[in-house]
């Protein structure tokens, strides 16, 4: 099974939904008490929103890229933004 890295916190509500859907799908496919292999980083969206509102898109992108690299370094095989 691949390990999924989630860049969460774009809204914590959507991150929660992704977490639930991924785990339900793994359980449906594999049965029993299986669950997804996940690594999640949850942004404080206020920080990201402040960068966006200030037009600092490069800084926002750099922040997301650093977190993505951290998740990859921790073993994530794939990444998604939630």
For each of these PLM feature ranges, what is it?
Residues 59-82:
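N-terminal glycine-rich phosphate/adenylate-binding segment common to multiple enzyme folds
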């Amino acid at each position: 099974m691949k390990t999924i890295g989630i860049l969460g916190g774009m809204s914590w509500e959507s991150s929660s939904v992704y977490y639930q859907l991924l785990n339900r799908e793994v359980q449906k496919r594999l049965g029993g008490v299986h669950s997804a292999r996940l690594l999640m980083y949850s942004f404080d969206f206020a920080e990201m929103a402040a960068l966006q509102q200030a037009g600092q898109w490069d800084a926002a992108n750099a922040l997301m890229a650093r977190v993505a690299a951290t998740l990859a370094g921790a073993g994530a095989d794939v990444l998604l933004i939630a």
